[in-house]
C-alpha cells in the first residue's frame, strides 16, 4: 500500500486549480443512463470512484470514453444488473438503480459492501422508488427493482435529509408519468448540479437547492454537454492548508457561493479572504489562526466533509475551539492520530474540544477515511520533522493528485510505493 512521506514545517503559498466535484460527477455519470442520446460531461475529476463508475456503465452496455471530457452513449444499454465485484468498493453504485428502473422498467444493484439495510440509508432510496410505483425485492444480496409500464409521479416526504436518496428519487422521477414533489429534499450544491445536468437533457425540474423539488415527468431525455461544478471540499481543504501554515493561496476554478459557511469560519480564524466569480484567495499575513467553534449540519450549514480539516486548524490555533459533529457517527478517527503528533484534544460524545498548540511533531500515522486522511497530510506539512501517512488509498478516492498540488504550493511530500 502506498504511503505519503511529508517533511515539515513548510509555509504553503501559491496557486492551485480546483478539480471537478466528485460528489456531483458520480451522480451525473449514473444519471447519464437516462439519456437516449450521447452526453459529454466536462470537468470530471480523475479519481478511483470515477473510474469504477465508468467501468460499471460500460458493463451495462453504455459506450464510455474519456479524452479530457467523459463521453457516454447509453442508447445501447442492454444489461440491467450492477454486479458485486464493481459495487463492493463504492457505495455510489446504488445510483444506477433509479435510472435503470425509470428507463427500462427493471434494475438490480448488488448491496454496497458490508452494508446492512437500515444502518445506512439505502432504505431511503428503496422507499422512494416504491412510492414512485416500483416493486422492490431483496434477493441474494441484490436490490431488485421493477415496474410495469412507467413509474408514476408521487408526493414524497423524506424521513430525513439524504443527498443520496434525493438524487435517486429525482433521477427516477424525470421519466415518471405525472408530477413528483420531494419534500425535505437535500439542498447541497451537488444536488443542484445533478438537477441542472438533467434539465440540459430535457428534464423538467424546479426548486433544486431548496427543500422542495418538483419534477414534471417527460417521455424521454436527449443528449447534451455539461460541465461539473468545482469541488467545494477540495477548495476548502486547500484554503485550510494555507491558513494553518500561515501562508497565502489563490484557488482557481472555484465556486465561492458553495462555501459560504466555510469562508465565514476562516474569516473568524483571522484569514484575509477575497472572492471573484471563479476564484478565492486567502492570506494569513504570517499570523497563526485563532480557534473557532464549528457545528456540522446539512447544507447550507457547515459541511461535515470539512470537519476534520477544521479540527486540525483548531489544534494549531490560538485558544480553545469546539467542533460538534451532528451528521455522522464515528467521525473523529483522525483525532487520536493527530494526538500522536502532539495535538491536545478531548472527545466528549459528538464534540471535540481542541486546545491549540504552537507546533506539531512528525509521526507515523494512519488514514482512516477520506477527509481524515487529508487532515493528516496537511498536519505533516506543518509539523516539525517527518510524517508518514499510511493507507492513502482513502485520499485517492476523493482528491485528484493531492501531492502534486501540495508540492506546487511548496510542500515537501512524496508518494512511497508500498509492498
UniProtKB/Swiss-Prot annotation:
Reactions that this protein is recorded to catalyse: phosphoenolpyruvate + UDP-N-acetyl-alpha-D-glucosamine = UDP-N-acetyl-3-O-(1-carboxyvinyl)-alpha-D-glucosamine + phosphate
InterPro entries registered for this protein in UniProt: Enolpyruvate_Tfrase_dom, Enolpyruvate_Tfrase_sf, MurA_subfamily, RNA3'P_cycl/enolpyr_Trfase_a/b, UDP_GlcNAc_COvinyl_MurA
UniProt modified residues of type 2-(S-cysteinyl)pyruvic acid O-phosphothioketal: 115
Its pathway is: Cell wall biogenesis; peptidoglycan biosynthesis
EC? 2.5.1.7
The record's listing under Pfam families reads: EPSP_synthase
- Gene3D superfamilies, A to Z: Enolpyruvate transferase domain
Q: Where is the active site?
A: 115 (proton donor)
* GO biological process entries: cell division; cell wall organization; peptidoglycan biosynthetic process; regulation of cell shape; UDP-N-acetylgalactosamine biosynthetic process
The entry assigns this protein to a family as follows: Belongs to the EPSP synthase family. MurA subfamily.
What protein am I looking at? Answer: UDP-N-acetylglucosamine 1-carboxyvinyltransferase
> Organism, per UniProt?
Salmonella typhimurium (strain LT2 / SGSC1412 / ATCC 700720)
